[in-house]
Amino acid sequence: MIIVIQLIRVIRSTFIGSAICSVSPVDINRQPEGKGLYPIFAIMSHYCICNARYTLNPKSLSMYVRARSNIRKGEEISVQYLSALSGNFKRRRKIRDEWYFDCECRRCSDPTECGSYVSALKCDSCSSGNVLPIDSLEYNSKWKCTT
């Protein structure tokens, strides 16, 4: 059974995760309206701080990719696979579970998440500091207060 699960992951990662992108457009009530396959979109890399964004037209199922910042010639085009509102741990775990890689981008590498402190907890001991992971790329990292 374990071999079957591993085989499914390899197939999913190879053919769905990188060769084909399956996206579900939603209607005004956020209900899925179907699926679309976007093979060119699928070659774009993920970065939590990306240089492009995508939108879907739910009526035509057309996908549009637009630059969020200036993209220099030869620079990789990247999009976010998940919401930027999720904290590092949740986002990285979902990326690992769904796309089978560990994101190590600038935001994921920074315990403060580029100053957003999305994952930070208020310190119970001092009430003025934030508790953050010591190593945000380590899933089992210890956390400590910033003060």
List the model feature ranges, each with a label.
Residues 47-147:
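C-terminal SET catalytic tail plus cysteine-rich post-SET Zn-binding segment of SAM-dependent SET-domain
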